[in-house]
Amino acid sequence: MKWLGNVLVSPGEGGVYGERTLDGYRVWDPYRSKLAALYTLGGGVELTPEMRVLYLGAANGTTVSHVADYVETVYAVEFAPRPMQDLLEVARRRRNIVPIMADASRPEEYAPFMEAVDLVYQDVAQPNQVEIAERNLVFLKPGGHLVLMLKTRSVDVRRDPAEVLAGARTGLEERLDIADVRWLDPYHHDHAAIVCSRRE
């Protein structure tokens, strides 16, 4: 990852969503991006030029555009029509983004467009967030990583966020090795990142 002092940046062409630039780099704001928050807090998976990433819950492509600055290919899955319009515009400026309009809980819908990936990044705020991540492990290479951004209030607004996180972790441990778990405060309240690796 590229840092200018304590500021996380990415090396692509700016102006994607009105982000600031610094010395020719795009500032990656942890208050706007949960992945940037994870890196700022000392966690995350290093993004490298040869990586292929499956990004679930691409939304309007803000974080996707930064990931694309670092890696070979980003398969960006989004289901909602309005954000998809913005994502398509981002993909026109980032040729290594493959926008896919599909339901992330049904990976069989986009399997024909996929190849094996090094990283699955899951940011779909649904009650079955863990299940969605697990269904998409079919695309993850052995030794690859899963980063799950858990929005605890979307899983169960009545339960304590720590309990929700513990349950998600237990579910993932059945198939993956947990590398890191951390809350994203102060950047994103009641959000936690779970970083896992697939067993060889």
UniProtKB/Swiss-Prot annotation:
The keyword Heme appears for this protein: no
One annotated GO biological process: box C/D sno(s)RNA 3'-end processing
Binding site for S-adenosyl-L-methionine: 62-63, 78-79, 103-104, 123-126
Molecular function via GO: histone H2AQ104 methyltransferase activity; RNA binding; rRNA methyltransferase activity
Gene3D superfamilies membership: Vaccinia Virus protein VP39 (3.40.50.150)
Cited PANTHER family: FIBRILLARIN, RRNA 2-O-METHYLTRANSFERASE FIBRILLARIN
Protein name as annotated: Fibrillarin-like rRNA/tRNA 2'-O-methyltransferase
Organism listed in the record: Methanoculleus marisnigri (strain ATCC 35101 / DSM 1498 / JR1)
GN (gene name): flpA
